[in-house]
Every structure is written in C-alpha cells, then in structure tokens.
Amino acid sequence: MFLAKNLKNNKIKVCLPKKKFAALSTASIQTNERPNPDKVLKDIAKYVHETPLKSSLALDTARLCFLDTLGCGLAALKFKQAQNIIKPIVPGTIVPSGTKILGTSYVMDPVKGAFAIGTLIRWLDYNDCWLAAEWGHPSDNLGGILAVADHLSRLNKATHGKNGKQFLVKDVLEAMIKAHEIQGIIALENSFNKVGLDHVVLVKVATAGVVSKMLGLSQEQTIEALSQAFVDGQSLRTYRHAPNTGSRKSWAAGDAVSRAVNLAYLVKNANVGTIPSVLTARTWGFYDVLFKGKPFSFQQRSKYDSYVMENVLFKISFPAEFHAQTAVEAAVKAYRILAKQGKTFKDIKSIRIRTQEAAMRIIDKSGPLYNYADRDHCIQYMIAVPLITGNLTATDYSDEVARNPEIDNLRSKMYCIEDTHLTQNYHDPDKRSIGNALLIELNDGTQLDEIFVEYPVGHKFRREEGIPLLMNKFQRHLREHFVESPDKVDLIMKVSSKTNFLNMQIDKYMDLFTEG
C-alpha cells in the first residue's frame, strides 16, 4: 500500500497493490528461554564425577603411559626450540607453590605449567596414540592433569592443608584414564579432521572435564567448564598438512591443555557461566558453525568407562607418526634383507607402499621438506632413513641429517596406494590395525617379497612384547637427560617399579625429575 496526495483538493488517495503481500514471517524472532545443557556435556560431567574405575588393566596401562610420557618430555629438552618455547616469559619467574616443570628448574603457575609440560610431552610425537575417525594422542592431557596436581599438592603443604589438595600418583593415573576415555570415545566416530579442525579440541575438552573435578568443582561447574571449552576458538589442522606443516603441531596440545586449565580456573574463581546449548544451538552452536550441522555420533560406544586406556597404542620402536610405525618396521626388515643379499638402498629401483586411507591423507608427501615437523609427517622420509641406516631416531629429522641427498633420491622412488582392506581393518573396533606393506623392486629387475606389518609393537595385540621395550625406552630417556646423575636414574626406575608407587605423593615423585 502507498499514498498519493492530490495537491488541488488536498485529498489523499489510497493505492492498493494488485498483488497481496505474503504473510509477514516471525521466524526471525528468537526465543530466549534457557535450554538444559546439551546431553554430551552432561554425560561427560557425570562420567567424571560419578563413574568409579574398576579396570586393573586400565590402571596398569595408565602407569606405563604415565612413565612413557614423562620420558618423552625429558627427551624433548634435547631440542633448543622446545627449550625456548616453554621458558617463562619473564625470565627468572618463580611462582610460590607453583608447578615444577620436569627436566628444568622452572616453577610456574598451573596454566603456564600446563603449556610447558604439554608441549614437552608432545614435542617428539613419540608418546601414545589413538586412531579412529579422529586421530590424537590422549596422553597430551597429562600436561594439564600433572600441572594442576603438582601445584595443588604443593599448595596443600605450604598452607598446612588449608588450601589445595594432596594428590597421589594413583589420582593422576585415574584422571588420565578418564581424560583418555573422553577424548577417545568422542573420536571413535566423529572426524574433526574432515571439517578442517585439529584434534586438540578434544584435548581441551577432556582436560577441562577432569581438571574441573581436581579443582573441587561440582558436576554443574564441570558442565560450565566443558561448555567454555567447546565454545573456545578451535585450532585448524593447517599446520599439520602440506604445504604449511610447521612446529605449531608440536605445541598445539600444550596450548590446548593450558587453555583448558585456564577455563577451569575461570569457572572456579569467577563463575563465568554455562553456555548450555553450545553444541546444539541453531546457527551459533558448535555443530552448525564447525561440524556442518552434524551432531556427534556415539553408535560404537555410548558409555564412558576405561576402553580407550585399555586399547591405547604406544610408540615404542620409532619416533614416527603412528600411521607410519609399521612402515618403518618394514623398512628396517628390508634393510636387513638387503644386507644379507649383499645389497643396499642404492640397489633399489622403486618402492610401492600399500597403506591405509588415513596415512594417505596425513603423511603421503612429495616435494621439498622444510623442517623437522615436515619430515616427521612424511611416510617416504620415515621409510628412506631406515633403508639407508637401519634405524630411525628423533635426530634423523634434523636439518643436518636431511641434507643427505640420498634421502630425497630414495623418496622419489616411492609411491603410495590405498588398500581398502587395510582401511577397513583400521576402523574395525576389534582390530584397530595400522598396516603397511613395502614392495621393493631392485635395479636388476628382481622384487623382494612384500614385507607386511599389520600391528606395531605398541598395539594391544603385541602388548606383552612391548612392555619391556617400553620400560627400556623410559630408562633410555632418563639416562640421556640425567647424564651426570646415574644414581637419579636408578632411583627413579626403582621408585617407579615399586608396588607402593601408586600411593606416592605426586609432588614428591616430580621432585625427582626437576633440576635444582
């Protein structure tokens, strides 16, 4: 409808449109009724606060995971960049009753301490692994768990029990089991990588959940912290993939656990509030914004218990991205076979790598490799080095080693193909295999028998074989760090093996790992 004014007689003419207007929509009017918290938040919080842990296998595995993770953290200190990333922003800062950082003399607040510990234990990509629809390293959560447990224990002593809480090694292990479970169960069917998100979002969520209880928060406050973790800006996987692979992948988990600890403290100290439909809110929620409108699926396992810790994968033999572990093992076998025939890598014409879809997406890489992080996420590089030397170590990713032109020459002779059967077994919850096979053709036209390795030493199916090797790995990392203190190495090994180890105060145990 519009109006036209007759200027002569000052009359107003009403003009109606020929077509009727459509009924006005009120769909844009948003209701402000506060919903109940999303079920995912409630389920996690209930698990953290109410579910008792009864699995002796999970507890035994958690002890191995704990020791292995600490050893990996010490080993990271051999690298200058790792040292520089974790040091205090203000030099010389010592926080009263703060978190002690393993392998150093640093004493930090629990937020910065979580970043430092989380960064060290992830730096070498040598700690445990969980492979499902989403990949990840659940022991990353120890960065936040240990930082909070150590600080609260020291605070408890300093205030004669008035503040803080005394944590035992067993408390830390149980927190690890629950953090592993939260991260791993969500990862079973929900692929964050396929929407471009990094798996450390799950580290942030899992750490926020278990740390909330450690801080004495209620179940409702834990929901509050979890909602804040989900709404927090999530990391992109850009830094894990060509052509942008870089060192951030080595400190992303440290960043995630520090943010989780900070959020839990914000809930504790400032009651920052719950975002109840953080996942399900239309338009603005996590699902619509970041997950293409798809809610999380929990068809394989709908309950949280201790499944993930019981089935976690250990990296024992090589500091290699887990999808390449069996490929590296196959390469070492190939090196020995060639040696028996009086041949070397120089006799190789081509190498076919039969692998799983996940490896194709993550570590199949050609062209120049620019840094350590680039190399330890290239399956061709991780195969080439042991074919040349017979082994693969953390230093083999260094610039010095990478200058060897034979490595890139050998890389150029390799190609990957996906075996859908291997991909199927990779996702099979009863197998969880990570198979790789190498078919090597020599310059004289002969072929070696294909070398196939389906399960790495750290897999549950090879756990008994792996346990003594895992303890040797832990002891090796101790010896390499405490070179001038062999007695300290012996003491740590002795204490860590005692039957009453679980009842040791966590701060007393961590004192054994610090300097000064």
Swiss-Prot record:
Its EC number is 4.2.1.79. Keywords: Lyase. It catalyses: (2S,3S)-2-methylcitrate = 2-methyl-cis-aconitate + H2O. One of its GO terms (cellular component) is mitochondrion. Disulfide bonds: none annotated. Pfam families: MmgE_PrpD_C (PF19305), MmgE_PrpD_N (PF03972). GO terms for molecular function: 2 iron, 2 sulfur cluster binding; 2-methylcitrate dehydratase activity. The keyword Lyase applies. Pathway: Organic acid metabolism; propanoate degradation. GO terms for biological process: propionate metabolic process; propionate metabolic process, methylcitrate cycle. PANTHER family: 2-METHYLCITRATE DEHYDRATASE-RELATED. Present with 2730 molecules/cell in log phase SD medium. Belongs to the PrpD family. Catalyzes the stereospecific dehydration of (2S,3S)-2-methylcitrate (2-MC) to yield the cis isomer of 2-methyl-aconitate. This is Probable 2-methylcitrate dehydratase. The lineage of its organism: Eukaryota, Fungi, Dikarya, Ascomycota, Saccharomycotina. The gene is PDH1.
